[in-house]
UniProtKB/Swiss-Prot annotation:
This is Large ribosomal subunit protein bL19. The gene is rplS. Belongs to the bacterial ribosomal protein bL19 family. NCBIfam families: rplS_bact. Keywords: Ribonucleoprotein, Ribosomal protein. It comes from Polaromonas sp. (strain JS666 / ATCC BAA-500). GO terms for molecular function: structural constituent of ribosome. GO terms for cellular component: cytosolic large ribosomal subunit. The keyword Ribosomal protein applies. Pfam families: Ribosomal_L19. The keyword Ribosomal protein applies. GO terms for biological process: translation.
């Protein structure tokens, strides 16, 4: 392992964040710390994970939800200090690593089967 990877691993262990096991297709609730002026509050963003990018400290994932008939996607950095917690609500059964095809679908065709036998958090 080279020096940069070693430093990233040390930083990840120093952050001491508990990240649940999640995969594309899972429905997650991401609690985000939002600062508005002097007030700080926690905002929940619930949706389907359509992509996961494993890059050590720079890992990220994209969550998609439909809000008022409009598709909303948000990219989150896994180790960001703005993320309070990640909670897996439902496990999805998919055969792809990237679910970008959900962008062009709506209604029943955009549904994802639930993985049977898997227990959500």
């Amino acid at each position: 392992m080279n020096l940069i990877q070693t430093l990233e691993q040390e930083e990840i262990s120093r952050l001491n964040k508990t990240i649940p096991a999640y995969a594309p297709g899972d429905t997650v609730i991401v609690s985000v710390n939002v600062v508005e002026g002097t007030r700080k509050r926690v905002q929940a963003f619930e949706g389907v994970v359509i992509a996961k990018r494993n890059r050590g400290l720079n890992s990220s994932f994209i969550v998609r939800k439909v809000s008022n008939g409009e598709g909303v996607e948000r990219t989150f950095q896994v180790y960001s200090p703005l993320i309070a917690k990640i909670e897996v609500k439902r496990r999805g059964d998919v055969r792809r690593a990237k679910l970008y095809y959900l962008r062009s679908r709506s209604g029943k065709s955009a549904r994802i089967k639930e993985k049977l036998g898997a227990k959500a958090a």
